[in-house]
Amino acid sequence: IIILRTFRARNFFINYKFLKDYDNLLFIGMQDEYEDLKKQVPNLEFYNCKNFLEMAQIIKSCKFFIGNQGLGYALAEALKVPRLLEGNPDFPVIFPIGKKSFDFYHQIHFEKFFKKLNS
């Protein structure tokens, strides 16, 4: 499961703490974004992508992608991998299109869609 959560477009109604109960979580964003999310998800691993092509290849090979607005989510959307978009209620301009793609603005929906894609 690939995660890329930027500082810029976060939904402050959402937390990722429930992911501590899951394995195989890989963060591919910036080091400081990883360190911030690792406070909530201690089992989160980090990979520093060499370039955007490698990032796209990693996203393409994932079980599913979780992210907010940014390059990572744009790649996941373009590649049509199963994906979860952390929607920003202050700036709702991106919407998932296609099968196995969901957006969430509230914690209950995040956990529900996560379980659906992880089954």
Give the label of every model feature segment.
Residues 1-10:
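Conserved donor-binding/catalytic core segment of Leloir-type glycosyltransferases
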Residues 10-93, 98-101:
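Donor-binding and catalytic core of enzymes assembling or modifying cell-surface/extracellular glycoconjugates
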Residues 95-119:
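Leloir-type glycosyltransferase catalytic cores
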